[in-house]
Amino acid sequence: MMKLVIILIVLLLVSFAAY
């Protein structure tokens, strides 16, 4: 369950970095 939360956070960070 925690892994899903971590993955979502990582995706958000990547999206901000790509922006």
UniProtKB/Swiss-Prot annotation:
Q: Origin, by domain of life?
A: Bacteria
Q: Could you name the Gene Ontology cellular component terms for this entry?
A: membrane
Q: Which InterPro entries match?
A: Toxin_Ibs
UniProt keyword list: Membrane, Toxin-antitoxin system, Transmembrane, Transmembrane helix
Q: What outcome is recorded for mutants in which this gene has been deleted?
A: None seen. An isbD overproducing strain cannot be made in the absence of the sibD gene.
- TM regions (residue ranges): 4-18
Note the topology in the membrane: Single-pass membrane protein
Quote the subcellular location field of this record: Membrane
Q: What is its main location?
A: membrane
**What does the record note about the induction of this protein?**
The sibD sRNA probably represses expression of ibsD mRNA, either by destabilizing the transcript and/or preventing its translation. Expression of the proteinaceous toxin is controlled by antisense sRNA SibD.
Q: Name one Pfam family in it.
A: Ibs_toxin
User: What the protein does?
Assistant: Toxic component of a type I toxin-antitoxin (TA) system.
Q: Which family does it belong to?
A: Belongs to the Ibs toxic protein family.
A further note on this protein reads: Part of the SIBd repeat region (formerly known as QUAD1d), encoded on the opposite strand from the sibD (formerly known as rygD) RNA.
For this entry, the protein name equals: Small toxic protein IbsD
Species this chain originates from: Escherichia coli (strain K12)
Gene name of the encoded protein? ibsD
